[in-house]
Amino acid sequence: MLEALRTAGNPGRGAHEPTLHASRLVYAARCAISKLLNAPDPSCIAFAANATQALNTALGGLFAPGDHIITTVCEHNSVLRALYRLRDQEGVQLSFAGVDEKGRLQYDGWQGLIQPNTKAVV
């Protein structure tokens, strides 16, 4: 444990060498991902503890009351919970695209779901 305390650093949480080293590694990762995704700047890249946290952060910051989102009932629970929260607490409108008896998306009905205030298909 003492070895970990002496050598481990928490990025952005101090000025000792292990922390500075960790910060440089995180920045290098941001640069590499930024380049891969053609992002305008490494600061546009955000890390999260897991996919659910990232999804909630992204969805929670993208929509305003009155915005419309198209999704399906087949989405993962973490997606649907985030969308239902946006609907129930933020006034976002949801439409659900249909699926057939085997759970396959029925694309022929999607165009009819698009509204002037549609901001995303999730």
Language model feature labels by segment:
Residues 1-122:
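Pyridoxal 5′-phosphate
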